[in-house]
């Protein structure tokens, strides 16, 4: 079993994703930067723009990392060598979630304009669906569609690459869904930060909900079974098995855990907005 690794990182670590280079790439929302963190804790920081507010980051099909810039309405791209590019969006769109799709493109949500959009690896942006309700995080589902949370619409959206949209309302009022991930059991899991619950949709079946106090924020699939969840309001991580068994891990007070990702070795990483990234033992 490997040991836990705690890496100090100023600038408000918010989200992170594993890159094709074996490192973890982190958005620094407060300072407007992107950081690269190796499995041994070595750090490199790349300035983007002070007002950019980098939010969610994902590995693209082109070998680069792509991220949303909610503060200045842009999509950013950074190569593993640190070369940056940006693609301007409509003013006030507030891009947030982003994920690689099955079509060799990136898909992202625009919270303020209420859109789900596609951006090709050469920067061509297409608005595919206008859903309203503040679409938040997005993931590629096991069925070839993009699934996303609609935070203020209290729903989960499913968008096929041809633009076919399905919206499913949540059974709990004002649940405030945020994080979302697809798992190897052909299901989609999501967090309900307003209801202190974790949701699961086995594709075409009924929505399932599990009580999970602590303001669950992000969720990521565990390669072995189940999911990891950041409990932002409780300064905890939760490990939830496929059959719903919950184990919580306490973090220091004031940690503000947000984004989660799985490293190349299967270990879970979490971004702590207080100024650290943490790699869990595996």
Swiss-Prot record:
Domain of life: Bacteria
Binding positions for Mg(2+) per the UniProt entry: 256, 273
Molecular-function GO terms, alphabetical: carbon-oxygen lyase activity; magnesium ion binding
Active site residues per record: 258 (proton acceptor)
Residues annotated to bind substrate: 217
Keyword Cytoplasm in annotation: no
E.C. number(s) listed in UniProt: 4.2.99.-
Biological process (GO), any one: antibiotic catabolic process
EC class: lyase
Listed cofactors: Mg(2+)
Gene Ontology CC: outer membrane-bounded periplasmic space
InterPro entries in UniProt: Streptogrm_lyase (IPR011217), Vgb (IPR051344), WD40/YVTN_repeat-like_dom_sf (IPR015943)
Alphabetic keyword roster: Antibiotic resistance, Lyase, Magnesium, Metal-binding
Family as reported in the entry's similarity comment: Belongs to the Vgb family.
Quaternary structure and interacting proteins, as annotated: Monomer.
Record HAMAP family: VirginiamycinB_lyase
Function text: Inactivates the type B streptogramin antibiotics by linearizing the lactone ring at the ester linkage, generating a free phenylglycine carboxylate and converting the threonyl moiety into 2-amino-butenoic acid.
PANTHER family named among the record's database cross-references: VIRGINIAMYCIN B LYASE
Identification of the protein by name: Virginiamycin B lyase
Source organism: Mycolicibacterium smegmatis (strain ATCC 700084 / mc(2)155)
């Amino acid at each position: 079993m490997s040991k836990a690794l705690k890496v100090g990182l100023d600038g408000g670590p918010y989200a992170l994703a594993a890159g094709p280079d074996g490192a973890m790439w982190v958005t620094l929302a407060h300072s407007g930067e992107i950081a690269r963190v190796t499995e041994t804790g070595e750090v490199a920081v790349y300035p983007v723009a002070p007002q950019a507010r980098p939010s969610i980051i994902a590995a693209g099909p082109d070998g680069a990392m792509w991220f949303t810039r909610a503060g200045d309405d842009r999509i950013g791209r950074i190569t593993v060598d640190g070369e940056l590019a940006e693609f301007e969006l409509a003013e006030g769109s507030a891009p947030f979630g982003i994920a690689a799709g099955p079509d060799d493109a990136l898909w992202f949500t625009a919270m303020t304009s209420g859109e789900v959009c596609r951006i090709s690896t050469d920067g061509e942006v297409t608005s595919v669906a206008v859903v309203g309700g503040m679409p938040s995080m997005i993931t590629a589902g096991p069925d070839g569609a993009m699934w996303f949370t609609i935070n203020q619409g209290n729903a989960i959206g499913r968008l096929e690459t041809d633009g076919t949209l399905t919206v499913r309302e949540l059974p709990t009022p004002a649940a405030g869904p945020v994080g979302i991930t697809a798992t190897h059991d052909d299901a989609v899991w999501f967090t309900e930060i307003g209801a202190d619950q974790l949701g699961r949709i086995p594709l075409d079946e009924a929505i399932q909900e599990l009580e999970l106090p602590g303001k669950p924020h992000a969720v990521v699939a565990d390669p072995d079974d189940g999911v990891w969840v950041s409990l932002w309001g409780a300064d905890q991580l939760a490990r939830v098995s496929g059959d719903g068994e919950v184990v919580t891990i306490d973090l220091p007070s004031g940690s503000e855990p947000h984004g989660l990702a799985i490293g190349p070795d299967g270990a879970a990483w979490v971004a702590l907005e207080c100024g650290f990234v943490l790699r869990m033992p595996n």
